[in-house]
Amino acid sequence: MQQFDLLGIGNSVVDVLYEVDEEFITNNKLEKDVMTIIDEEKAENFYSKLKQGIEVAGGSVANSTVGFASLSGKPAFIGKIKNDNLGKSFSKSLSNAGVFFKTEPIIDGPGTARSFIFVTPDAQRTMNTYIGACSLLSPKDMDEKIIKNSKITFLEGYVWEEDLAKESLVKAAEIARKAGNKVALTLSDPFCVKKHRLEFKELIKKNIDILFANEFEAKELCQTQDLEESAKEISNMIEIVAITRSEKGAKIYNAKEAVEIKAKVFNKVKDTTGAGDLFAAGFLYGLTKKFSILKSGNIASITAGEIISHFGARPKTNLAYLIQKELTE
């Protein structure tokens, strides 16, 4: 019997959230609604100049594992931190949420990663991320026993920045598939896709069963402005592709069908940070329970809807209870 339902492999990041206006984005020459990699100097500059932000343990796939745990699933996570205060905070947050996390921290070198997330009044988020210790994730960190004993291994596209990290993801995917398990990938960000498009396509063709992308990432991957065209191309490569479209919901494709998923909104949309992460959590949870792509997609819509109703990318409601309530009404 497998020990874990889901293993996430991704960046171990502490999010620092700020509510800002459009003028702040313009004045600081930030590229809105994407993730930009920054160096340690710029990260320290943000820390020293800005008022106290809301600090929450984050990281895209790490957020997904926390959401998965809240759904009553059994998740694990692999990611690199430093043995510093932020690293200890990150590790504790995962453990408290019910996520198994035992990756060895580094003692010397760059600090634990942090992401400055600037949320504008339209609820869009602009991220400036210092990768820090995440850059040292290596194939040695890929725990073969955990990978073999996880139903689905979920890889984070953001990690595809360092050569060692690339080797790590490929190694994990190969171990998982040889063990007869599924491998999922989130493309993470349009800029990330633009930068690594050909490498991502090769990875998807060789090692991925389930792909998550928003409509901009899917179009960038396939070099087309036609969403259906990009979905068809991706569907020919893999088993399942889920394409999220913000307030328009999502479309999910497999070899047999394409299903439309309506967006679920609880109250007002306050912060879209983590919407894709929690969509993935809900969908993958459904797949581990052998639900259809339609039912899994509806669960995903509910979990994403919860996360955008408040600040931060970690659920504030017991998702298992919420799903039970929403699906029985």
Task: Please place each PLM-identified region on the residue numbering.
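Conserved phosphate-binding/catalytic loop of the ribokinase/pfkB sugar-kinase fold
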Residues: 102-106, 117-163
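Active-site nucleophile and cofactor-binding loops and adjacent substrate-binding regions
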Residues: 52-60, 105-109, 274
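Conserved phosphate-binding/catalytic region of the ribokinase-like
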Residues: 1-7, 12, 26-32, 174-178, ...
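Conserved beta-alpha-beta core of the PfkB/ribokinase-like small-molecule kinase fold
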Residues: 152-232, 248-250
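Hydrophobic beta-strand scaffold residues
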Residues: 75, 101, 183-184, 241
